[in-house]
Amino acid sequence: MTLNQWQYGSKSEELVLQKYLEMDYKLIVQNFEYRLNHTAGRLGEIDLILEKDGRIYLVEVKARNNNKFGPVADQVNKNKMAYIYKTYRYFIIQREYRKYREAFFQFDLAIVFKNEVKIIPNAATFDYY
């Protein structure tokens, strides 16, 4: 059975989440969306937000079965980072997540290629925002 693109992406996120959980990370939220209201379109999304030892990890999951469109990591550019940072700023002002406002955070990129997970810790910085 072949998976469609959405199913493969969802399965890949679960593989990455399992890997983080095995390393004693705690899941805060999966697929956090930045929306101003329920009728407006999505303004941002973070695949996984995790916590370990007081640090917050923002994880972008990229999954591919081939390199037809070039290396997966190349798809996380400055615009994508701005999108993630904007979403993170929205995340920390939400009532249930305010306790994380003072926490140090980092961005990890998780690449799933042919069902193999590779995590690139601290893959990029938010210095230019």
Role assignments for model-derived ranges:
Residues 26-56:
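Active-site metal-binding core of divalent-cation-utilizing nuclease and nuclease-like domains
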Residues 3-6, 14, 63-115:
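Catalytic cores of nucleic-acid endonucleases
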Residues 1-35:
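Acidic-basic catalytic patches of nuclease active cores, encompassing PD-(D/E)XK
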Residues 55-57, 108, 118:
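Protein kinase-like catalytic core scaffold
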